[in-house]
Amino acid sequence: YRFPPLKRLSFDYVVDAHLCQTTDELQAFYDTYTEQFFQAMETGKQWGITVSSIKYHNLEQIKMRACAGGFDLTPQGTLSMCFFVSSPKEAFYHDFIYGKVEGGKVVMDEAKFKRLVTCSNNSQLKCGRCFLKWHCAGGCLYHTKSYSKEMLEVMCRFQRKFSLIALANLLTGQNILKHEST
């Protein structure tokens, strides 16, 4: 082979406030993503490929905030807290950029970095009662900035549904979505 065979694939969902006009459209989008993700996971097993995603990986972690934060270098030489944000053309670019590489050195706004890295949404009232509080940790800052309150509620439902399916699949050793429809 010119390239070694694939061993791992990550399929993550799209985050775009303009992708769907209504909460029903967004829910349908995430429902389709969930079905396709678990189908891909099953297909991957047949080929010896581990299929994962950010949401799936988060189930293996206990954390205080949704994301540890990034040291993501953009094409402009700036440092972004979030891999979703990499271009000055993006609405939240200046919210997530905290430094740059200049003259062969990393220059950081340490106060902004600290603000970004300590930001957490897991103190929301609804999170206190959620079984995913320490895995979802209140959701992603990028989601919070991107979506309306109603759209964020769809994200919460998606997170819970996706996680329950993942856990049921692990317990049963099969894709419950596939067996649910037969």
Segments (PLM) and residue ranges:
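Short, small/polar residue-rich loop motifs at catalytic or cofactor-binding pockets
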Residues: 64-67
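Conserved AdoMet/S-adenosylmethionine-binding subsite of the radical SAM
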Residues: 1-8, 40
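Short, ordered coil/turn segments that flank beta-strands lining enzyme active or ligand-binding pockets
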Residues: 74-75
